[in-house]
Amino acid sequence: MPKASEIKKFAAIEHNGKVFLVKDIKKLTPSGRAGASLYRMRLYDVATGSKTDESFKADEMITLADFRRHPVMFSYIDGEEYVFMDSEDYTPYNFNKDSIVEELLFITEDTQGLQVLTVDDLPVAIELPATVDMVISETDPSIKGASASARTKPAIMSTGLSVQVPEYIASGEKIKINTAEQKFMSRADSK
C-alpha cells in the first residue's frame, strides 16, 4: 500500500468502502515546525460519479483499487455521450460529457495516445497523453521577426482550449501542447 504522498493523479483508490478516482491533488504544508504535510485530493466516486474532497496525512497508507488501462480512439458523439473505441478489441466505452469536460478540450478525431481507465470493467476516466498536437483555429496575426522576443498571445483551438503562444505563431498552424500544464511546447511536426 502506498503512502498518500506517493499517490498520483488518475490513481484509483479505495476509501471508506468505495472506489474513487483521484482527479486532482494539492499539497498543503502547515506553517508550524511540527506540522506534517497534508494532501488534499479531489475524488470522484466510480459508482455514482459524485465528487468529494478528502485530506490525507503524507504518511497515511492508502489502498489502491484494481484498475486497467485500455488504448482507445475517439469514435463519435451520441447526444450527451462520447463514445471511445478500444484500439485492440473494439469495445466501446461511453462517457457522459459532464464527466470528461476537462479532457474534451484536448480531444479531436485525430488525438493519439488516449487511454480509458476501467475499474471492474466499468470505464471511469479518460487519460490523456503527455502532449497533443492541435491546430490553431483563431489567434492574432503573426508578427514577422518576433521569434527573438518572449512575448505571447492567446490562441484558441477548435475544441475551445485557449493557450498562450509566441507572437510568430499564426492561425492554421499545428502546435504541440502539454496536457498537464495546458501550455504551448513547440510547433508540431508536419507529417
Curated annotation (Swiss-Prot):
InterPro entries: Elong-fact-P_C, NA-bd_OB-fold, Rib_uL2_dom2, Transl_elong_fac_P/YeiP, Transl_elong_KOW-like, Transl_elong_p-like_YeiP, Transl_elong_P/YeiP_cen, Transl_elong_P/YeiP_CS. GO terms for cellular component: cytoplasm. One of its GO terms (biological process) is peptide biosynthetic process. It comes from the Bacteria. GO terms for molecular function: translation elongation factor activity. Signal peptide: none annotated. Belongs to the elongation factor P family. PANTHER family: ELONGATION FACTOR P, TRANSLATION ELONGATION FACTOR KOW-LIKE DOMAIN-CONTAINING PROTEIN. This is Elongation factor P-like protein. The lineage of its organism: Bacteria, Pseudomonadati, Pseudomonadota, Gammaproteobacteria, Vibrionales.
